[in-house]
Structures are given as structure tokens and as C-alpha cells.
């Protein structure tokens, strides 16, 4: 049996929802899992940044795959893993989340699917360190994750109005999550905490209602974006261009450097072009795409090997 797993890219934070809010996007990495007839680990990769993918046990997909069986207290089976990449690495689009989710979902499928999505979410979050990418990557849609009184994850499925279109501009340079976290302060003021709490609430309400004026106000943040902007050359110019082209707002996607604008359907192409040409004018190689929310999350199917 061979299992194919398709995992969507994600955009985390959505401005003020730092480490708790994220949405799945219609850009996918694909993974194929099968028992290795050789009895040894076999990994092949193709597509975007494929040359950067580890071909041994350090591979993040394999590490998640192995973690599943270790939690089950079962031996890790020999694996034949094929990877096809469309989500660029270290760009703020949840590439590591696609790897972790794929590894867990593939392992669960080969084991006969003993785990629920809730169990997969818990281990994925443990491996990733935060839920804002792995949860929407697995479940789809826009998701808000928070701890309950027993320190378990409470995950809310949030409405995303069809009048809000995600537009991403992806520059050709990497920015690791670790580097993006190093620039953040260790403490915040009460006023900044209150500011973000209010704006997360407004993001949730505006996304559900389709109210663009609310969304334009809601996407502001004081916890991470002001500090990370300096790591992204051309940020201010691209933000200005997107707003002038009609975007409701622009935020850093995840840890960056990808920038996410949210637009009305009729302005999406103008926003895409404005972001693309403005960033290219700074000398960077950039691509820009109009995407949609991936409502169904990770997809899995069994295939017959040729």
C-alpha cells in the first residue's frame, strides 16, 4: 500500500493573533508513504527547494513519522518517502508544518488510522512548538488555538468571509523562525497586551462578517510585527503599495519574509501586481499569487504502487 498525503501551506498570526491564529492556503506539498522493500529508509524529493531536503533520518517528515510510532511504543517501520514541494522553505508559509503533519498523517494511515485528528493535532503542536501552523494545515480553514484549564488545546474553527481574498508576495530569501523570534522583546507592556487582545477579537469578527473597515483596523499588531519588519527589506514600500492598490491590510505571514495582503475580489489582481512590482523594484526576486482558504486541510488517499 502507498499513501498520498497533500498538506496545505499556512499563514500564521494574521497580524495580532501571534502564535494562536492561522489559516490554510491553497498551495500544497505532496508526500507519498510506503513500506520500503529494501528494509532501509529511502527518501526522494523534487520541486521547489528540493535540493535542501535531508535524505536521511534528520528529515523532518521522517522525524514526525518516527515520533508517531515511538508514542505508540512500536518499532518504526522502514519507509519509502517521496516528497513533491510547492511551498518554499523558511518563507513564513508553514513549510515545517506541512512536513510534521504529513509525517504524522502518513504514519497514522500506515498503522491503520488508530489516532483521531485531535491526537494528531496534539503531537503536531508538541513537535512544532506552537499550534498556529500545524492546526490549520491538518484541519483546514482558519483556526484559533488556546489552552483550556487542563492545559489541553481548545481549537475553534473560524469563519472566513468569501469577500476576503489572500494575496501573498514571496521573496527569494529565507528567514528562519528562530531568527525572527530572536528580535522579539522578552516582556511587553500592559497596554500592548490589551491592544493585541482587542485586535484579535476584531480580526475574528471582521473575518466572519466581511466588514472591510473592521478588518483594516484589526490587522494591527504590537507584539511581533514592529520588531520583525526590519528583517524584511522593502516591507514599508510593499505595505504602502498594497494599501494604495486597495488591500484592507498587509501583515507578515508567519515569521516572514512572505507578506500577506487581504483584498476584496475585485482588487486582488491590482494588489498582487502592486506588491510584486514594488518589491521587484528594490532588486529582489519575488513571486506573488492570489490564493484562497483551503477549507478541507490535509487530504489523504491510498494508491496502488506502479
Swiss-Prot record:
Positions of disulphide bridges: none
Main location: cytoplasm
Any one Gene Ontology cellular component term annotated for this protein: cytoplasm
Keyword Plastid: no
Record PROSITE patterns: GHMP_KINASES_ATP (PS00627)
Entries under Pfam families matching the protein: GHMP_kinases_C (PF08544), GHMP_kinases_N (PF00288)
GO annotation terms (biological process): threonine biosynthetic process
GO molecular function: ATP binding; homoserine kinase activity
Localisation per UniProt entry: Cytoplasm
Reaction catalyzed: L-homoserine + ATP = O-phospho-L-homoserine + ADP + H(+)
Keywords: Amino-acid biosynthesis, ATP-binding, Cytoplasm, Kinase, Nucleotide-binding, Threonine biosynthesis, Transferase
EC number annotated for this UniProt entry: 2.7.1.39
Keyword Transferase: yes
Functional pathway: Amino-acid biosynthesis; L-threonine biosynthesis; L-threonine from L-aspartate: step 4/5
UniProt xrefs under InterPro entries: GHMP_kinase_C_dom (IPR013750), GHMP_kinase_C_sf (IPR036554), GHMP_kinase_N_dom (IPR006204), GHMP_knse_ATP-bd_CS (IPR006203), Homoserine_kinase (IPR000870), Ribosomal_Su5_D2-typ_SF (IPR020568), Ribsml_uS5_D2-typ_fold_subgr (IPR014721)
Classification via SUPFAM superfamilies: GHMP Kinase, C-terminal domain, Ribosomal protein S5 domain 2-like
Sites where the protein binds ATP: 88-98
Function noted in UniProt: Catalyzes the ATP-dependent phosphorylation of L-homoserine to L-homoserine phosphate.
The family this protein is said to belong to: Belongs to the GHMP kinase family. Homoserine kinase subfamily.
The name this protein goes by in its record: Homoserine kinase
Species name: Synechococcus elongatus (strain ATCC 33912 / PCC 7942 / FACHB-805)
Source organism phylogeny: Bacteria, Bacillati, Cyanobacteriota, Cyanophyceae, Synechococcales
